[in-house]
Amino acid sequence: MKVVDRIRAMENFVEEMKQKRDTVVKLLMWEIGKNHTDSQKEFDRTVDYIYDTIEAYKKIDRDSAKFQKHSGINAHIRRGPLGVVLCLGPYNYPLNETFCLLIPALIMGNTVIFKPAKHGVLLISPLIEAFKKHFPPGVINILFGRGRVLATPIMESGKVNVLALIGHSSSANSLQESH
């Protein structure tokens, strides 16, 4: 996808996501045990984060169109996708923290393998259709199950270019070693 197409896809996704607010908030409450106010805050903070990420990406794209001079050398730096990103989200803020990993990976043009936390998987279900509607097939791949059981063989395949994980450093080190 071109830059403009990725931005448009993300803008359309977040608009549709906002329409699912009540459902996602209820699922946060039921599944994680957060109170209503905290669940609303997490949802709203996530929407704000997506908009901020879109704006930051627009700035990066604008700035990359300019030449930079450093030590007498002119350079044109273009940022691009890195490949396959494995995103493993935490359970305590399963929407916000997970999307802090997922959204930048998507907007930069990467293919994402996304495994929601074991507590917080249901809140993703109302958003799956929005992902499917606004991104091409194969760009977002969602897996459900135990992290160790799923992530280890994926990392062992050697086909993951970026590991995006919010969790304990021992988990990250173990997954890195299996790569």
Language-model segments: residues:
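Rossmann-like NAD(P) dinucleotide-binding subdomain of oxidoreductase/dehydrogenase enzymes
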Residues: 62-179
